[in-house]
């Protein structure tokens, strides 16, 4: 019983510290990423490590398009309300659809690509560089 009380007390003490580590999402830098048929714009996405960013994705095509970067999203701290969008490392957008995702990127070089094989073969890939 005493051990359970100690564990509960430790949890209560750690909760405010965890809340303080959340980024200030309102100050996030905004970056637009366009999904065109067979390409992303920009092809190289440059972000600052440890700084919150709001990524605005827009499907500028005439068909469903996707953006997959599983390792990037897994390494980044994604805002809690946006995690459902990248549950499997990416998402799909219908023509004209928009999606914004706030995250704190981890340093590294990451690869993004379409979830559709034909689109990947035609060059629908991008690099994400976080320094």
Protein language model regions, located:
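Extracellular/periplasmic metallocenter environments
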Residues: 20-25, 39, 88-131
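N-terminal post-signal-peptidase region of extra-cytosolic proteins
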Residues: 35-43, 54, 84-89, 96
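N-terminal edge beta-strand
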Residues: 22-52
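Bacterial N-terminal signal peptides
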Residues: 4-14
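A mature extracytoplasmic/lumenal domain signature
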Residues: 37, 51, 59-61, 69-73, ...
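Short aromatic-acidic-glycine turn motif
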Residues: 73-82
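Beta-strand cores of secreted/periplasmic/IMS beta-sandwich domains, seen most often
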Residues: 43-67, 97-106, 110
